[in-house]
């Protein structure tokens, strides 16, 4: 377990000086200068900026809700009730691009500066939206100027080393566990290709990402989610029209 900085810059720097394993959540100051980069870069203290809930400005989460139609993501809707997705995504907070440039993207540029000075950066998505949050965090880290390869390392070997599991996972090497993500497109060409997952191999079993059914040597369909179970008293029909849960009222709009 590692503590977070709590959006307090002086607390963050004290954590670095004290030799904490890492700082969770971004520091609320951007940009930073040589005093911070040299101190942090020589400390071996990790950094998990969690831009998706960016301290000190607009969150990256708002950016990706604004820039993508989340309610149209068919794969996401396989694993999350539509009422939950609609309520989070169809009514969006909108902001000018320059506001994001001065908020989570500026923070991401500071992350890149720290990485260039020796700080190991890790990807952590805060659990904002299972299925997309990790991708959004990855793409947000990339917005700061890291190369595609550097960005991918934050989600793989850097994070594995950070939690003490780097000898077992985090890279494809002889002797490590064969837990593998199989993508349709190469994220080294476009970082958003991280979202083209075909198969997940974990603990010697392979799963189809579109259905979560086990495939390969021992095919086995997954069990139904609670909202797919015929014995479940549903409060809404499953996968109806995308606007079917919007209840307009005289004084505004309400949604599940």
Model-derived regions: residue spans:
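Acidic, glycine-enriched loop/beta-strand segments at the rims
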Residues: 132, 147-152, 162-197
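Short catalytic-loop micro-motif centered on adjacent basic/acidic residues
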Residues: 1-3, 22-25, 123-124
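Active-site neighborhoods of metal-dependent hydrolases
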Residues: 26-144, 217-219, 223, 228-256
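Divalent metal-binding pocket/active-site signature
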Residues: 1-15, 53-54, 105
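Structural recognition of alpha->loop->beta junctions
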Residues: 10-32, 118, 143-151
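Divalent metal-coordination and catalytic microenvironments
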Residues: 23, 47, 126, 141, ...
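Short aromatic-centered micro-motifs
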Residues: 200
